[in-house]
């Protein structure tokens, strides 16, 4: 016997069905409107761009949301327990680094990084780039510009890649004037993600890989891997090269450099041929759980936002800790405080090893100098220098990566621990050399408790360095900008 619905039940079911259909209709309508708006943006662009366009302001009218959030990379209002977007003098906090970089420009100046909009400003103001008096003067090659501006691909196209690299940094001061922006990651005509720097493409080719076959999700990391990687300047032409031929690990790259007989500088105290790590962010991220699970850089550093019915990537690229509700909590259900402390716990533990390693390594350099002064021979010091080189490479590789102790905490702790082991082995080896020369006491240690004291110990004249840079910023840089404006390299305000 069939059970008939009561009248009110029928009306309720009918009304409920209508509500469901209405809500679904609204969802479909909203989706269609959103797609239509996105399509409208591309089909009715106010500014038609052909070829390479370095002036970020020209994308503002067609992509106002992305442009506005990109300008927020100029902010200096966030500090976590470790880094943020505020420039902090790292040498003042950890003066042992002055000793580790003795004989290299980083011993003069090293601060925590700021946002992309400060890229040109910060490299120009850094003591590391010196105070060149003319286009053929100065300590750095033009290769140093490579990751600082969308003007770089324009200059590479105009001059050729080899010719661009094989110049002085000051040669292009009036050409490279727009900070990291739109065309670095996007094809200016289609706005698709693209690779604008040749070094990444070349690294893939040497590994037998075709970067054009990367998936859209992979591209959300690969555009970052154009710059946030380990690299070196190869040969007299200072050709930017990624040492990935043997693999991504610290040992793989060390083997690559050793085989090539490469070093960045000879240490002023210990005479060690030192490898200076850059910032192997992409490589280390691939070794952590997020990278292994396919999470991209943009997923956490450029989370999606919705505004006016349009979903877009937040171009305020910054630490995910500044927006945990839109980054970590997209996948993890824990509270902001818990998630923040999860990150800090990993960083603190890695930094315990880092701090000890910096202390031991600084002593190893000083003790090696003492051994040379006592008459040690090159043959006697061979093993000492090899151990110092290995220890410092592991230290620098582990600390130069921004966020590495979160991206791959186990790998970073492994690397730093191996570095500490080699630093202590180096000190033991030095003591044996000294014993052969009749010295068995502790090596006297200088006072390097502050940046200023450490810089004085290694012979830097910081007053002269700062005075020269101040003059350079007041005279040369304004002239660069005036010429850039006259040549149309900067957008008119």
From Swiss-Prot:
Q: Where does heme c 4 bind?
A: 297, 300-301, 407
Provide the binding site for heme c 3. Answer: 116, 224, 227-228
Q: Which sites bind heme c 5? A: 290, 328, 331-332
**Class in the EC hierarchy, top level:** oxidoreductase
Signal sequence range: 1-25
The record's cofactor note says: Binds 1 Ca(2+) ion per monomer. Binds 5 heme c groups covalently per monomer.
Protein name, as recorded: Cytochrome c-552
The species this protein was found in: Bacteroides thetaiotaomicron (strain ATCC 29148 / DSM 2079 / JCM 5827 / CCUG 10774 / NCTC 10582 / VPI-5482 / E50)
């Amino acid at each position: 016997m069939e059970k008939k619905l009561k009248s009110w039940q029928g009306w309720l079911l009918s009304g409920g069905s209508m509500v469901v259909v209405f809500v679904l209709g609204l969802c479909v309508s909203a989706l269609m409107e959103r797609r239509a708006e996105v399509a409208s943006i591309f089909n009715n662009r106010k500014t038609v761009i052909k070829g390479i366009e370095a002036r970020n302001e020209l994308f503002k009218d067609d992509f106002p949301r992305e442009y506005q959030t990109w300008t927020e990379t100029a902010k200096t209002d966030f500090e976590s327990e470790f880094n943020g977007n505020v420039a902090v003098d790292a040498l003042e906090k950890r003066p042992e680094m002055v000793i580790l970089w003795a004989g290299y420009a980083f011993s003069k100046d090293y601060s925590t990084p700021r946002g992309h909009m400060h890229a040109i400003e910060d490299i120009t103001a850094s003591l590391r780039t010196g105070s060149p008096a003319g286009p053929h003067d100065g300590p750095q090659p033009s290769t140093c510009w490579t990751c600082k501006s969308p003007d770089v691909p324009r200059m590479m196209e105009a001059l050729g890649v080899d010719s661009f690299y094989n110049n002085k940094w000051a040669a292009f001061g009036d050409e490279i004037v727009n900070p990291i922006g739109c065309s670095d990651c996007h094809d200016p005509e289609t706005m698709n993600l693209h690779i604008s720097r040749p070094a990444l493409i070349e690294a893939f080719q040497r590994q037998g890989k075709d970067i054009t076959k990367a998936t859209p999700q992979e591209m959300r990391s690969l555009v970052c891997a154009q710059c946030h990687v380990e690299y070196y300047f190869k040969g007299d032409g200072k050709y930017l090269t990624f040492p990935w031929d043997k693999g991504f690990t610290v040992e793989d790259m060390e083997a690559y450099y050793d085989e090539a007989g490469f070093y960045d500088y000879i240490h002023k105290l210990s005479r060690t041929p030192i490898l200076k790590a850059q910032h192997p962010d992409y490589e280390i991220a691939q070794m952590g759980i997020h990278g292994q699970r396919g999470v991209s850089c943009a997923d956490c550093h450029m989370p999606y936002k919705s505004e006016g019915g349009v979903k877009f990537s937040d171009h305020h690229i910054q630490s995910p800790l500044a927006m945990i509700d839109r980054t970590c909590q997209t996948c993890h259900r824990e509270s902001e405080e818990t998630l923040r402390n999860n990150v800090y716990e990993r960083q603190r533990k890695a930094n315990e090893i880092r701090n000890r390693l910096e202390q031991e390594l600084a002593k190893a350099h000083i003790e090696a100098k003492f051994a040379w002064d006592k008459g040690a021979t090159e043959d006697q010091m061979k093993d000492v220098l090899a151990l110092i080189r290995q220890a410092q490479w592991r230290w620098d590789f582990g600390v130069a990566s921004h966020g590495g102790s979160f991206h791959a905490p186990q790998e970073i702790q492994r690397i730093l621990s191996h570095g500490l082991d080699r630093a202590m082995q180096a000190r033991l080896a030095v003591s044996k050399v000294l014993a052969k020369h009749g010295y068995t006491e502790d090596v006297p240690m200088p006072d390097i408790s502050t940046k200023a004291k450490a810089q004085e110990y290694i012979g830097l004249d910081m007053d002269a360095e700062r005075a020269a840079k101040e003059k350079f910023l007041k005279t040369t840089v304004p002239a660069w900008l005036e010429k850039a404006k006259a040549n149309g390299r900067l957008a008119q305000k």
